[in-house]
Amino acid sequence: MPLLDSFKVDHTKMPAPAVRLAKVMKTPKGDDISVFDLRFCIPNKDIMSEKGTHTLEHLFAGFMRDHLNSNSVEIIDISPMGCRTGFYMSLIGTPDEKSVAKAWEEAMKDVLSVSDQSKIPELNIYQCGTCAMHSLDEAKQIAQKVLNLGISIMNNKELKLENA
């Protein structure tokens, strides 16, 4: 089985919060599809709470679209990593990492401004597979931690695993 791109980087060297351009590929029509690693926690040192991660999943994608989508960039999806240390963001176009970091920072401020749990999008039995597993307070704690620590840019060359 071929090694996935996400396993070709040394997770012991990853800073967090940090942005990494993980992959760029071309569609058959020549458009760039980019995948960003938005690392909220240092791998194997910290983890996002289950409920906080789920609530962020509902809030983060919309807020990131508000701050990053443009004539040359369109977010396809933002999904939490199974390890709960971050999210992957797939998009059409390839914004620079500083723009992604700025949009992420603004999105975290937006999370902090959500007034109560009833304002979480798609939080109902029809649109969410586990609608009882949410915590706006935990999502806000995650967002505040990102803002307190600041978002850095990861260097793929420094993270590359030998023989990967």
UniProtKB/Swiss-Prot annotation:
Binding residues for Fe cation: H54, H58, C128
Q: Provide the coiled-coil residue spans.
A: none
What is an annotated GO biological process for this record, any one?
A: quorum sensing
Q: Which UniProt keywords apply?
A: Autoinducer synthesis, Iron, Lyase, Metal-binding, Quorum sensing
* Keyword Chaperone set for record: no
Summarize subunit and interaction data from the UniProt record for this chain: Homodimer.
- Family per similarity comment: Belongs to the LuxS family.
The protein's name: S-ribosylhomocysteine lyase
